[in-house]
Amino acid sequence: YAKILLFGEYGIINDAKGLSIPYNVYRGAFQPSAKADNAEKAKKSNASLGAFLAHLKMLRADGSLIPNLDLDRFEADINEGFFFDSSIPEGYGVGSSGALCAAIYDRYGIDTINPEENIDKDSIVKLKAIFGQMESYFHGKSSGLDPLICYLKLPILIHSKTDLGTVTIPEPGTGNGAIFLLNSGQPGETQPMVNIFMEKMKNKGFRRVMKEEFNKYNDACVAAFLKGDTK
């Protein structure tokens, strides 16, 4: 699945609360080359998987790879022409790289944490560390939150970097109000925007606004949404 970070964008970097939910309108899965609708796109995806595999092999070689992955099987599939067939738009913040990392862990992981079983906080923190390392290949640095949502397919409430857990969100109601996605038509890269935010955080005035104003209203939005209070 894809994901949507409803509340906490950038704020979670500064320990504001965050609420992220899976978004099943978009999804992705590994497919053999024979099932490709677009041969050129499949070839490009296959090449990207090969580059990612090389990165994972390098981490394994220096002993720093956190997840236990069957990289030999991954390599065999790549050599057979496998690609990641995804409807998730890239560069729109809905978890395209996160879904890929989750799919790799799900397909090639050994002794994985089963998302169908009861997931406790320790399991979530472990998964977050695994996915954070994997997705860092794409963004330079990753919290691991996006692939975590994609893998668990459950809403996650983030209190801090190490305090997070699954949560139940209110059932959809009836009326005129709704949360919706608006396609800006302007894809962008995550890392440059994070860099801009971190640069702004060096400013004392900006840090004060984030701490005293943004975090307060952001956390209030999360609490109200979970209670179903949308007025």
For every predicted segment, state its role.
Residues Y1, L5-F7, G11-I13, S20-I21, ...:
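C-terminal nucleotide
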Residues A99-D111:
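Stable alpha-helical structural segments in soluble proteins, enriched in small hydrophobic residues
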